[in-house]
Amino acid sequence: MRTTTTSTTHLLIFLTWLASIASASAQSTKAKFDPNEPLEKYNMPPAYIYRLETSPRMISPFGAFISFQVNVDAQGNNILGDAANEPSIAVNPTDGSKITIGWRQFNSVQSDFRQGGWAFSTDGGVHWTFPGVLENNVFRSDPVLGAGDTGNFFYLSLRETFFDDIWRSTDGGQDWTRLTFGDVTGGDKQWLTIDNTQGMGHGFLYQAWSTGGNNFGGRQFSRSTDDGATWMSPIFIPNSPVWGTLDVASNGNLFIGGAENFSSPFRCVRSSNAQNPAVTPTFDQNTQVDLGGNLLFGGGINPGGLSGQCFLAVDRSGGPTNNNIYMLASVEPFSGGGTNVMFARSTDGGLTFSVPQRINDDPVNPNKWHWFGTLAVAPNGRIDSVWFDTRNAANNTDSQLFYSFSTDGGVTWSPNVPVSGAFTPFEGYPVQNKIGDYITIVSDNTGGDVAFPATYNFNPGTGQHEQDVYFVRVVPGGGPTPTPTATATGTPTSTPTATPRPTPTPRFAPTPRPRPTPGPRP
């Protein structure tokens, strides 16, 4: 019975993989938003794990960049048969060597039951400790992490009920304490930001979520004024933007970016009084933003998920670009065909935005995908953007992580640079046909820390590559010790030299090359 079940599962996985390849290559069946989009809900029980097997941890160098596997066991090994995706990263702003990453942890690819996984590093991302999940056998999804200015980490997690809860770590991500109990906030695709300015909203936590998987009649926003312990009753956001993020300007104004109609147009919504604990926040500015296309759900590159969310970030450098607002997303052009990383900026507090600007600098090709685009702003005002890119793939689907930066407020961007080897996004699916919905980056004055999923490890038991979470540090110019190119407003946080600890012999990824479509397993 075990052999028959396993063979059937492998056949289904292979057929799904073939369908994904055909969809991505043909470019003829890409779907816009479906109101019946699968939400992050409990579908299957945890899979029984007969025996936990391991292989050496993956370390994948590419030029001057090295990607380190994050989801490893207590001995530093890769865990065969599991899956990890949708990573969110937080970095201690007072000590850049202390990093934590949360992700959707699937203990077995035989079940889409997922939990709140996390790992921490104390040496700048070279070595990682994966203690386990927030709560054993508790369904969780959509992990979103953030850091307060004193170094506390926060972990926002969606539960199967479509309510969320928030956890805090005061020791660099080694231990977590749940702060909220009961059903007070949350919905599908929730996001978090923390007010790290020195105004009256200092330390406030803000979160917004989708109108889908929503228990509050479409209300999407809440605030905590006591470090996450309690939250106000949710309120409406004008035009109901979804699948986006939030950030706070240096004057304490809160900005929310997202997509209207689960597609486009995009919105930038401001609250200037959310920082005032004595009032219920109101939204006093609402701007339509053109990013040159639509957010895409069910595209051929990530069939069961998004091709990326909308990311909003605010410049708090104190320099010439201070309080600029930036929005970026991987969008499908209105004419159709693939996705591009598109960017717009506001220099007047979100009142108006620039025309959309294409960040990926390869020739326009509707068969190529530039997906999971994200961005962050460094304390010195440099903007970093990373995304998955298929420009070098003969099959138009094998993906690499690419990087570009801007030191003039997004007016010009550096030539795009690949920073990882290529991987196939169609293998290692944990029943659901996606590799998450987003990747994340945190920037400091000398570079950016990135968390992303990839399928570098190969599992001989399934005959497929596996979804795992990786960390890579990107730097302007690609050198190991970059110098900031804009005026810094604080002491730069450099990446410390790692102190090695005993680990198994790492396995290195080969130089990426186009791979043929694999044949079926018998």
Where does each model-flagged region fall?
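Bacterial N-terminal signal peptides that target proteins for export
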Residues: R2-L12
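C-terminal PAP-associated
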Residues: Q27-T481
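Bacterial N-terminal signal peptides
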Residues: H10-I21
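Accessible peptide chain termini
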Residues: M1-R2, P520-P522
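Ser/Thr-rich, Proline-interspersed low-complexity disordered segments
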Residues: G479-R521
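Sec/Tat signal peptide C-region and signal peptidase I cleavage site
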Residues: A22-A26
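Sequence-pattern detector for short linear motifs
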Residues: T5, S20, N273, D348, ...
